[in-house]
């Protein structure tokens, strides 16, 4: 389930570090978090959709790798991001 352009623009404007920022770890993690929450809601209704469940696990793994990278490079940005997104670590 791809995100609509409006949702992407809102996430980018909220989490961007500079203008027109699409590739910073904060923006990427925020987008992945939104997709993960959408897929989680989908799987609550469609419990036997195993293809989407695998996609969810891949997204969670990608987000975990990005968060690990951010924690290694700048721990303060990492802590601010997980606090802002409400993630637990």
Swiss-Prot record:
Entries under InterPro entries matching the protein: Ribosomal_uS15, Ribosomal_uS15_bac-type, uS15_NS1_RNA-bd_sf
Coiled-coil residue windows: none
GO cellular component, one term: cytosolic small ribosomal subunit
GO biological process terms held by the UniProt record: translation
Database matches in SMART domains: Ribosomal_S15
GO molecular function: rRNA binding; structural constituent of ribosome
SUBUNIT field: Part of the 30S ribosomal subunit. Forms a bridge to the 50S subunit in the 70S ribosome, contacting the 23S rRNA.
Protein's name according to its UniProt entry: Small ribosomal subunit protein uS15
Species of provenance: Parafrankia sp. (strain EAN1pec)
Gene encoding the protein: rpsO
């Amino acid at each position: 389930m791809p995100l609509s352009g409006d949702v992407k623009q809102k996430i980018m404007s909220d989490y961007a570090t500079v203008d027109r920022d699409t590739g910073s770890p904060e923006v990427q993690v925020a987008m992945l978090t939104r997709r993960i929450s959408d897929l989680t809601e989908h799987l609550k209704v469609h419990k036997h959709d195993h293809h989407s469940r695998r996609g969810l696990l891949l997204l969670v793994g990608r987000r975990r790798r990005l968060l690990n990278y951010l924690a290694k490079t700048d721990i303060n940005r990492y802590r601010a991001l997980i606090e802002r997104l409400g993630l637990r670590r």
